[in-house]
Amino acid sequence: MTTVSTAAASGPAVPPPRIDPDVPAKVAARNLNFYYGQHHALKNINLSIAANRVTAFIGPSGCGKSTLLRIFNRMYDLYPGQRVEGRVLLDDTDILDPKLDLNLLRARVGMVFQKPTPFPMTIYENIAFGIRLYEKLPKSEMDSRVEKALRDGALWTEVKDKLNASGLSLSGGQQQRLCIARTVAVRPEVILFDEPCSALDPISTAKVEELIDELKTHYTIAIVTHNMQQAARVSDYTSFMYLGEMIEFGPTDKLFTSPSDRRTQDYITGRFG
């Protein structure tokens, strides 16, 4: 993996214009390009993700939306043969700086994946494990942090009497909420959701969507989803991506009711995708 910062060539990093000038940008991408080998997966992406809002990324499979999400916490570093150009700012921190401590970055930018991935340990330890990576707490404080995380994950009342049970013993929906609780336990600033409900039943999906709406009070959220109805329900802003390009980005209500680009209109009305 090679990271190329364009700061020297393009001057100071000036984030793209915000959709809502009254809402500060938490994450901003500027002239972002990403390559898998010779494949140009993301093409000149420019956007600002508003703080304490939910931004959804929609588009057909292979359009680059999950790739973009993984750039925000440098998950792509785990794979060889990839290259990124441009700037991505988390507040004033350049996420693409090769000298950046990735452990600290991933504490600031947490991620919840498509399939629930609880650790093969107790419910309590699923939460405490991540906290211990960054903080050394006495038992009483750790207990309080675990409880708060499980409450934030809307799971506490369901598991408070079985914290020593395996996280793998929970239902699929509970496991996903455990993963969300595990993510918020380390107190991130941004949470990335990559198709978090695709493996869940409608009832579990509704619980996760309700939780996302509650979490944006304290966190900036970006979500990738193939479910356009879900994007319309949970997000404040939506980006439509196609063939590695960001075709349209704006307030969710406007994008779904009066899109500016014909390709967006064709996608949301089911003409392709």
UniProtKB/Swiss-Prot annotation:
Residues 1-20 are annotated as: Disordered. Residues 27-268 form the ABC transporter domain. One of its GO terms (molecular function) is ATPase-coupled phosphate ion transmembrane transporter activity. It catalyses: phosphate(out) + ATP + H2O = ADP + 2 phosphate(in) + H(+). ATP binds at G59, P60, S61, G62, C63, G64, K65, S66. Its EC number is 7.3.2.1. One of its GO terms (cellular component) is plasma membrane. InterPro entries: AAA+_ATPase (IPR003593), ABC_transporter-like_ATP-bd (IPR003439), ABC_transporter-like_CS (IPR017871), P-loop_NTPase (IPR027417), PstB-like (IPR005670). Part of the ABC transporter complex PstSACB involved in phosphate import. Responsible for energy coupling to the transport system. Belongs to the ABC transporter superfamily. Phosphate importer (TC 3.A.1.7) family. The complex is composed of two ATP-binding proteins (PstB), two transmembrane proteins (PstC and PstA) and a solute-binding protein (PstS). This is Phosphate import ATP-binding protein PstB. It comes from Nitrobacter winogradskyi (strain ATCC 25391 / DSM 10237 / CIP 104748 / NCIMB 11846 / Nb-255).
